[in-house]
Amino acid sequence: MPTHTATSRDITAELAFLSRALKAPALLDAADRLADRARDESWTHQEYLAACLQREVAAREAHGGEGRIRAARFPARKTLEEFDFAHLRGLKREAVAHLGTLDFITGKENVVFLGPPGTGKTHLAIALGMRACQAGHRVAFATASQWVDRLAAAHTAGKLQDELLRLARVPVLVIDEVGYIPFEPEAANLFFQLISGRYERASVIVTSNKPFGRWGEVFGDDTVAAAMIDRLVHHADVLSLKGDSYRLKDRDIGRTPSAATG
């Protein structure tokens, strides 16, 4: 018995050392947690090893997903599961569920959410971006004006093409709030280069409070707007969100007065 106990301690210490050497802490935890179950259920050595490795892989994926979420710089954390479909008109759960499969990333396609402020466009864009991070894809989030500022800084530094190439290697860019701030001609040109450079190469998720017919106002040029829309929607799912603002639904502001109250 003493020999067996000492051997068990030696094996435990060796497993701890090996898991540290492999930088696989979840492997040690899984080996300990699953040992009794493996004995009770008469697992083969291969089954026990596979179960332990599965735990380590799952832990690494979860850790990697968290790191990608932080690197994406989302302004908040949102999920598809918590989205309130009842508040909107015409948006089908099936359409959003299909986007949640992330097939559009594999196909290097785009997603566009159109609708008035407060209808959940940014929520859905973030939720898709977070799911992409959890699935192993790199994602970068910023508003349209922030993306333009970033490209303008690169242009001033003489590094615009380097920056565009670097961004082209990111599988998913989330571009929020297209249309909230009109672009000057130079800014519109930079934004066009961003969209054009990703055409059929990588995915973009865009939100806008303006219908496509008014994008000429945003970019100051109907021709530029048409060319941009053409590249953006050629391979894209375009979803229109219709409804009152989430942010105003529990407040009196924004509500239409009744006849009784004038």
What function would you assign to each model-found segment?
Residues 16, 20, 24-76:
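Interdomain "pre-motor" coupling segment immediately N-terminal to P-loop NTPase/helicase cores
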Residues 50-103, 107-110, 249-256:
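AAA+ P-loop ATPase motor domain of ring mechanoenzymes
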Residues 1-13, 17, 254-262:
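Intrinsically disordered, low-complexity and often Lys/Arg-enriched segments
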Residues 91-169, 216-219:
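Conserved P-loop
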Residues 13-20, 29-32, 50-51, 67, ...:
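Solvent-exposed alpha-helical segments within well-ordered globular domains of core cellular machineries
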